[in-house]
């Protein structure tokens, strides 16, 4: 019998306009007020931890159940239709009071991606949306992205702590993934060092990116890395000894 996996949390519709070929050094070379840019097709697919990790594991042969929330709107229909193509929409919740989350992904050649993101129904996702009867049968519970889910970072992450603790008590291994934080949003004002300090005792596998972790634990270092990258990808300018090890 296959060991079961639960992937829960953030799901959205990703809309990625395809830019013309040719790397540039700054966003301003491409995007400026009043300018018209002739684009390629738009790549439309599911995004977020639930779809990205869940469907990948399913395609690799794992017995996966997805748990996420969408609105009763056109984007929600599109997400569920895509998941249905993988026989994976069971466990998804439709909330008539919420709108479906989406991201417009600006992937300009030579520039780190820019995300225009609407969290939508993800903001209201809570422990009560988890089917614990299924969790009790699972060997692994993977959750992401609390950084884009207001219910999970409010009150110093009380709901996130409650979730991961409750899941770990069922005997399942727990895994937590993050996403980038908008510094000007409520998530950007949250005390992430405190939230992580309260949550990680109930997490077996923690898989943030260096940018996400640096933003949360050392904002000055994060801003320094952004300056050093000069509009490019931060990972291109990282030093293992000076930048990565101090965060470990």
Specify the residue positions occupied by each region the protein language model found.
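Short, well-ordered alpha-helix to beta-strand connector turns
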Residues: 2, 137-138, 171, 203
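Conserved phosphate-binding/catalytic loop of the ribokinase/pfkB sugar-kinase fold
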Residues: 91, 95, 105-157
């Amino acid at each position: 019998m296959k060991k079961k996996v639960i992937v829960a949390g953030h799901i959205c519709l990703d809309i990625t306009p395809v830019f013309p070929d040719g790397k540039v050094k700054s966003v301003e070379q491409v995007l400026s007020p009043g300018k018209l840019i002739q684009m390629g097709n738009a790549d439309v697919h599911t995004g977020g931890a639930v779809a990205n990790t869940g469907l990948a594991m399913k395609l690799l042969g794992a017995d996966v159940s997805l748990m996420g929330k969408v609105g009763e709107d056109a984007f929600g229909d599109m997400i569920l239709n895509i998941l249905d193509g993988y026989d994976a929409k069971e466990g998804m919740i439709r909330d008539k009071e919420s709108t479906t989350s989406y991201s417009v992904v600006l992937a300009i050649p030579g520039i780190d991606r820019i995300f225009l993101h609407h969290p939508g129904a993800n903001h209201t996702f809570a422990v009560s949306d988890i089917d614990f009867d299924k969790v009790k049968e699972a060997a692994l519970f993977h959750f992401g992205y609390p950084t884009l889910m207001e219910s999970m970072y409010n009150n110093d992450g009380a709901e996130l702590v409650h979730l991961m603790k409750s899941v770990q008590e069922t005997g399942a291994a727990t895994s937590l993934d993050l996403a980038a934080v908008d510094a000007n949003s409520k998530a950007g004002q949250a005390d992430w060092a405190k939230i992580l300090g309260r949550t990680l005792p109930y997490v077996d596998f923690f898989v943030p990116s260096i940018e996400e972790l640096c933003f949360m634990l050392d904002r000055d270092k994060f801003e320094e890395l952004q300056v050093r990258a000069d509009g490019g990808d931060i990972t291109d300018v990282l030093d293992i000894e000076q930048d990565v090890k101090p965060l470990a």
